[in-house]
UniProtKB/Swiss-Prot annotation:
PANTHER family linked: 2-C-METHYL-D-ERYTHRITOL 2,4-CYCLODIPHOSPHATE SYNTHASE, CHLOROPLASTIC
Source species of the chain: Xanthomonas axonopodis pv. citri (strain 306)
Residues holding a divalent metal cation: D12, H14, H46
Catalytic activity: 4-CDP-2-C-methyl-D-erythritol 2-phosphate = 2-C-methyl-D-erythritol 2,4-cyclic diphosphate + CMP
Gene name as annotated: ispF
The family this protein is said to belong to: Belongs to the IspF family.
The protein's role, per its UniProt record: Involved in the biosynthesis of isopentenyl diphosphate (IPP) and dimethylallyl diphosphate (DMAPP), two major building blocks of isoprenoid compounds. Catalyzes the conversion of 4-diphosphocytidyl-2-C-methyl-D-erythritol 2-phosphate (CDP-ME2P) to 2-C-methyl-D-erythritol 2,4-cyclodiphosphate (ME-CPP) with a corresponding release of cytidine 5-monophosphate (CMP).
Gene Ontology molecular function, alphabetical: 2-C-methyl-D-erythritol 2,4-cyclodiphosphate synthase activity; metal ion binding
Residues forming coiled coils: none
TM region(s), chain numbering: none
Protein name: 2-C-methyl-D-erythritol 2,4-cyclodiphosphate synthase
Enzyme Commission no: 4.6.1.12
InterPro entries according to UniProt: MECDP_synthase, MECDP_synthase_CS, MECDP_synthase_sf
Cofactor note: Binds 1 divalent metal cation per subunit.
Length: 166
């Protein structure tokens, strides 16, 4: 049986390290720390990539962009998202909507949420109202609550747009 919809979910986390900003949803956000990562460490785009890949059982971001590969050192995660979107479209799918939650005490995400939504919608060539970005804290519990890092969760609904390219 074949369905015209697929659901995927993704999660990413990075510890804070030296730096003066974090990348979130393709947007540079000033912060007292950067993140420790092989690429730019954008937890929003990484979680979104994993959700998209998972919906079609295509593995995870680490398989497609292994940290052992020097090509991805300090890479812009927008490249990852566009690659994942290309894989979906090659198979006749596209993102119907994405729902993303950032988990951290700081930086405050709210002031940047619209810019993140706009960037993601632009990268995926979907409507702005198909992208939700929100934030929560962990009430000072765990590594995010202690200000040691940042995490993101993403859920996507994919819709079939065409038969897969042969």
């Amino acid at each position: 049986m074949s369905f015209n919809f697929r659901i995927g979910q993704g999660y990413d986390v990075h510890a804070f390290g030296p730096g003066d900003h974090v990348m979130l949803g393709g947007v540079r956000v000033a912060h007292s720390h950067g993140v420790l990562a092989h690429s730019d460490g954008d937890v929003v785009l990484h979680a979104l990539c994993d959700a998209m890949l998972g919906a079609l059982a295509l593995g995870d971001i680490g398989r497609h962009f292994p940290p052992s590969d020097a090509r991805w050192k300090d890479a812009d995660s927008a490249q990852f998202l566009q690659h994942c979107d290309g894989l979906l479209r090659e198979r006749g799918w596209r993102v119907g909507n994405a729902d993303i939650t950032v988990i951290c005490e700081r930086p405050k995400v709210g002031p940047h949420a619209v810019a993140m939504r706009e960037r993601i919608a632009d990268l995926l060539a979907i409507e702005l109202d198909a992208v939700s970005v929100k934030a929560t804290t962990s009430e000072q519990l765990g590594f995010t609550g202690r200000g040691e890092g940042i995490a993101a969760q993403a859920a996507v609904l994919l819709g079939r747009i065409a038969a897969p390219h042969q």
